[in-house]
Amino acid sequence: PELIDLRDETRSTLDMYGVGRKDLPNAGRGGGKNVFSNFSTNCLLARRMVERGVRFVNIYHASWDHHSNLEKELRYNATMADQPVAALIKDLKQRGLLDDTLVVWGSEFGRTPLGENRGGRSANTGRDHHPFSFSIFMAGGGIRGGQVIGETDEVGWHAIKERMHINDFHATLLHLFGFDHERLTYRFKGRDFRLTDVAGKVANKLIS
């Protein structure tokens, strides 16, 4: 109960996260009642959990599946997410918590750089699922910030430079958590197996 009681937070902190802010009109598919304020509150609660020693916090933001109405949907979700996510990172840093907290913002795949206009959907163009190039941002927790790693082709269809496989990403996370991913290897039927598979490598360029 104490954790979710925000009465001890200053007005400036609540405003920084956007707690109490109004939803945008003409909601996207992720719309509902008070979703902007609710997501802001969730980000603030994440900081409060970290302060109290919670080891893993998952903030879920839904409805980025923009197969149609891209302009409206993307503006709605980005406006909902940008302020409180930035506030969370700033707040963690101001309180001396960011160096020991790894912040990861990502999803399971990206979106196509070219438009999608499939039958049965709105006539307004959207984007389809795209596993061949997408980005994740990371902050704090041993990350060397202020850099962009990797590059796509000219249209954003394929990653072509400094590509990071998901196994490399997992190996890097484990390293940041203090685990040597190669020590998690086991042998079965003549082959080595591990969480990061045998090709996964730590992305040292990411690490401070």
Regions from the PLM with identified roles:
Residues 1-208:
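Ligand-binding pockets and gating/stacking loops
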